[in-house]
Amino acid sequence: MGALLAVLAEVVELASVTGLSVESFISGEAFATAELLEAHIANLVTVGGLTEAEALAATEVPAEAYAALTSLSSTFPQAFTAVAATELATTGTLTVGATVAAALYPYYYDYSTPVANLNRGLNPEMALQLWFPEIDYEFPGLMPFVRFINYIDPTQWATNLFETIGRYSWESAQRYGQNLIAHEVRSASRELATRTAQGFSEAVARYFENARWAVSTLPRSLYSGLQSYYEQLPSLNPMQVRDLHRRLGQPIPNRIALEEQAIKSAEYVQKVDPPGGANQRIAPDWLLPLILGLYGDISPSWESTLEDIEEEEDAPQKKKRKRTKKNTPRSA
């Protein structure tokens, strides 16, 4: 451990002298910088005819930093790695050895265990007395105030009083803020849910109100319609019909125009304009209960039905009496 600390101290000292970082010394970048600087100084001395001091002044490198860089060895990172690895191996070996020795050390169950005995004047085997907190029957909060006055420090009474009042004020403000935030969140979520439900009901009611309704009897007369359809089918297929019209010199039918035939599957409900020219919202009598129900108004007929259902659900269930067999006297 001492060798590693000594090497680290030397690295920190070199970093402070040369101006380079400690990471550059450990990784080896500082040695490449030292070699480049030494080659540049030698080039200035050889080619430029300058002295070493003049070359250092020209490159703006202090003499102490240059001396420290030139004194470095290129094998410093390998040496530092070897020292760190040796230290790690030694520490790890000692730690593992101590752990294994502690795990393999025999344990005996004859160690004495200290037992608390606070009732020495009474029965040593007697249990401790139960503690009951003091209850303020007369005035809530009086006992803590009296205890605070009794324990107050005369030399620092103002500091203690200010700390107590400040803490109480802060806790009250924090509690009030939390309750206010929770109330606002609940009210905002409730308002958002109500607004969403109202918007959905409004959109559905507007859709049904402005829709084009048609009355159709197709579901009730499905089988009769199929029967009449198959009865009215011609005996010739479309190819034979076109061949027959071609022989008779009549126009050949290419397709059946359904619009030209007097076949209607439904009757549209006529939409009446608002009376009086006030452009208010109107709805037919048969559609009015549906729209009012979407807005929350229940029609009297539905209301009575719902009340009957609620009464049936809320009414107490009558207990069924168990049938018991009558004991009939046996004939002797």
From Swiss-Prot:
GO cellular component terms listed in the entry, alphabetical order: host cell; host cell endoplasmic reticulum membrane; host cell nucleus; membrane; viral capsid
Motif annotated as Nuclear localization signal, chain positions: 315-323
Record region (Disordered): 306-332
Lipid-bearing positions (N-myristoyl glycine): 2
Region of interest (DNA-binding), residue spans: 305-332
Region annotation (D1) ranges: 265-300
One Pfam family it belongs to: Polyoma_coat2
Keyword RNA-binding found: no
GO molecular function, one term: structural molecule activity
A biological process from GO: symbiont entry into host cell
Biased composition range(s): Basic residues: 318-332
InterPro entries: Polyoma_coat_VP2
Highest taxon in the source lineage: Viruses
Keywords noted in UniProt: Capsid protein, DNA-binding, Host endoplasmic reticulum, Host membrane, Host nucleus, Late protein, Lipoprotein, Membrane, Myristate, Viral penetration into host nucleus, Virion, Virus entry into host cell
Family to which the UniProt record says this protein belongs: Belongs to the polyomaviruses capsid protein VP2 family.
Descriptive protein name: Minor capsid protein VP2
Biological source species: Squirrel monkey polyomavirus
